[in-house]
Amino acid sequence: MNPADLPDTLDVAPLTGETGEPCSFGILIKPCRAGRHIGELSVTWLRALVYSHQLVVLRGFDHFASSDSLTRYCATFGEIMMWPYGAVLELVEHANPDDHIFANSYVPLHWDGMYLDTVPEFQLFQCVHAAGDMQGGRTTFSSTNAALRIATPAVRELWARAHGRYQRSVELYSNTVEAPIIGIHPLREFPVIRFCEPPDENDATFLNPSSYSFGGINKDEEEMLLVSLMKTLRDPRVYYAHQWQTGDFVLSDNLSLLHGREQYTHHSGRHLRRVHIHGRPQIANHHLVRSE
């Protein structure tokens, strides 16, 4: 795709944050006329946009009528990271959920694949049906390299000493991970934050939380670590909450962003599809704690 052609065919603008100001990351792309399909856009161009902007929202395009159609498209974007259930995770509220992912609860900030042998580079999301504007369910994103830029030297020094240890058991895995708070992007070498945010400790309704501990710092520094991380990662300069519209298609960089979800109204009909795309080459998860 020739960038010179973009003004006549596509409307490209920065994402807008809570303050009404443009976000420091992310772009919104809309077609200038109806009837244009997502599959008509250059995959090479879209990948380059994710590298440059971390988060790309496509809105107003014709999209995929089924999970099979979505899977075929995603395979052109890169090698799909397959799960026992297949390529596509249907993110819908379950009647009797056994995990917070399938409840209507909030989801704390985290990165995908943190408990698996390989970590996906990209997430592709399709919004099959959006919750109402006042029903919650926004997907939240935090740019960790931007967070590192705005952190004070004292806070950054604290983060540099700390590491998190997380354990989680679900139907598909039961693993332990130990990751430094400040790590290095496994393909591009710039610093990023790897942090799995604990849920609200007073929320007894949160289903199947991970277990958390933090090392490398003094015990009396742990509260400062968590407070500074949660405050900085939600600073409007580095944070974006996406209000879904039916048909939205979102591409995100799993290696430099953290993401989560806001609580949404019970029985709202919120339905997303998610596909993971491997890195080139595949990214081994060196944070897994291997049993001897």
Curated annotation (Swiss-Prot):
PANTHER family associated with the record: GAMMA-BUTYROBETAINE HYDROXYLASE-RELATED (PTHR10696), TYROSINE ISONITRILE DESATURASE (PTHR10696:SF53)
Name of the protein: Tyrosine isonitrile desaturase
Coiled-coil regions listed in the entry: none
Record EC number: 1.14.20.9
Keywords recorded for this protein, A-Z: Iron, Metal-binding, Oxidoreductase
Cofactor note: Binds 1 Fe(2+) per subunit.
Catalytic activity: (2S)-3-(4-hydroxyphenyl)-2-isocyanopropanoate + 2-oxoglutarate + O2 = (2E)-3-(4-hydroxyphenyl)-2-isocyanoprop-2-enoate + succinate + CO2 + H2O
Keyword RNA-binding: no
Membrane-crossing residue ranges in chain numbering: none
Its job: Catalyzes the 2-oxoglutarate-dependent oxidation of tyrosine isonitrile.
Family: Belongs to the TfdA dioxygenase family.
Residues bound to Fe cation: H110, D112, H259
Keyword Cytoplasm applies: no
InterPro entries attached to this UniProt entry: AlphaKG_dependent_hydroxylases (IPR050411), TauD-like_sf (IPR042098), TauD/TfdA-like (IPR003819)
Cofactor(s) in the UniProt record: Fe(2+)
Originating species: Erwinia amylovora (strain CFBP1430)
Molecular functions per Gene Ontology: gamma-butyrobetaine dioxygenase activity; metal ion binding
